[in-house]
Amino acid sequence: MTAWPGHWARPTEGVRERLSVLQALLLDVDGVFTDGTVLRTEDGQEARRFSVVDGHGIGMLREAGVIVGVVSRENSAITRARMEKLQLDEIHIGATDKAAVMRDIVARRALNPAQVAFIGDDLPDLAAFDVAGVRIAPANAHPAVRETADLVLHCSGGHGAVREVCEVLLAARGEGPMANGF
C-alpha cells in the first residue's frame, strides 16, 4: 500500500466521492500550469516555464480516459504549443468568457456539469467555477478563489499543482499509484 504524500491535499469524503465520477478536468494556464511569471527577452520575446512532471500527470489522466483541456484568457503561442504537445482534448486559448466555453464543452461532450472539475487561481476563474461540479485551487490562488474551491491543493501553480490534482483525481477513481492511499 502506498502512503498518501503529506505534501498533497487529501480531499474530504464528500469531495472524494465527487472526484470519483469526474469525466473531465479543465484547467486555467497562468497560475496553474505556470507560476504566472512571463519572462521577456531583450528582443521582446515572451517565455513561460512548464513542468514536465505536470505534463506526465496529464498523460496519466488521458490514459485513464479522462478528458483534459485548458480554458485560458491569455492568448499565447507558447501556451498553445505546450498544450498541443500534451495532446489535450480541449484547447481554448484567448477565452474571454470562461463560463460560456465550459458550458460549450459540457454540451458538446454530453457531460453533466457534476462530471467536470476546473482548477483556477484568480478572480476570472470564478465564472468557470460556476459551471464546474468540482472547483479546485492551487495553493497560490487568490483568497476568494481558495475560499470558493472545494479542494485547495498543497502545491502552487507551476510547482506541481497540476501533477497533484491529476494524482488526487486518479486516486479518487481508484486508479493510479496513490489509489490505495485513500
Q: Which positions does each model-derived feature cover?
A:
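Short, flexible loop segments at the rims of nucleotide/cofactor-binding pockets, characterized by
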Residues: 3-4, 9, 45-48, 69, ...
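Short coil/turn segments at beta-strand junctions that form active-site/ligand-binding loops
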Residues: 21-23, 66, 114-115
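Basic, amphipathic juxtamembrane/active-site segments
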Residues: 37-59
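Substrate-recognition element of Asp-dependent hydrolases with the DxDx(T/V) motif
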Residues: 58-82, 129
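Non-catalytic pre-domain segments flanking phosphatase-related domains
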Residues: 1-27, 175-182
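Asp-based phosphoryl-transfer active-site loop
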Residues: 19-38, 129, 162
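Mg2+-dependent phosphoryl-transfer enzymes with acidic/Ser/Thr/Gly-rich catalytic loops
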Residues: 44-51, 78, 84-86, 90-92, ...
